[in-house]
Design a protein with these regions (language model features):
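Active-site metal-binding core of divalent-cation-utilizing nuclease and nuclease-like domains
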Residues: 44-71
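Short, basic/polar, glycine-containing "phosphate-handling" surface segments that engage DNA
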Residues: 1-18, 69-73, 79-97, 101-161
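Charged, often low-complexity linker/regulatory segments
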Residues: 1-42, 51-53, 158
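Short, solvent-exposed secondary-structure boundary motifs
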Residues: 41-42, 53-57, 94-99
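Generic alpha-helix structural propensity
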Residues: 23, 27, 31, 59-61, ...
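Secondary-structure boundary/capping signal
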Residues: 40, 44-47, 107
Length: 161
């Protein structure tokens, strides 16, 4: 499956969840977990496992853990509800500050925008689709920046060697 098709399917899945009208943040987790697994597979990293709601860490409870399935943590993901259209406020929060400086490879996302941090510093940010279209119009948002989003996710997974 090519990148555009993969991301378009992901956006369609998010839209289906959003249209129900009763979705919480956790309702979107399966779509992201599936996307991450497919990107890992497509980039030759089939050994990467995605754990949703992993056990607590010294810094708190991020929503996802990426790991090799045995002994090596690749990174963590903190997800926020797609209704949280501006991640700047989250980025400045005490919670994310803790995560950024504890986890050397971290993604912050509202399922549409993805921000990659390495050792606490923002190294990449990609808007894959407009939250307004999903949240207000309840329509599948058009895919934007597919190649850049692919590169960000591949870069995050690259820690898996």
């Amino acid at each position: 499956m090519n990148r555009k098709t993969l991301f378009t399917r992901y956006l369609h899945n998010l839209t289906e969840v959003a249209r129900r009208g009763d979705a919480r943040e956790e309702s979107f987790y399966a779509s992201l977990e599936d996307l991450l697994a497919q990107v890992a597979q497509a980039t030759g990293r089939a050994h990467v496992h995605v754990t949703t709601l992993p056990k607590s860490t010294e810094a708190g409870n991020p929503d996802f853990r990426l790991w090799n399935g045995t002994d090596s943590i690749i990174g963590y993901i903190e997800a926020k509800n797609p209704a949280q259209e501006n991640l700047d406020h989250i980025e400045a929060s005490e919670q994310l500050h803790r995560y950024r400086w504890t986890f050397p490879n971290l993604i912050l996302t509202n399922f549409l925008e993805f921000r990659l941090y390495r050792h606490g510093e923002l190294v990449d940010s990609v808007l894959g689709a407009r939250p307004y279209v999903l949240n207000q119009l309840r329509a599948a948002p058009p895919l934007e920046n597919a190649d850049k989003l692919w590169d960000l996710l591949e870069r995050a997974l690259a820690e898996s060697k």
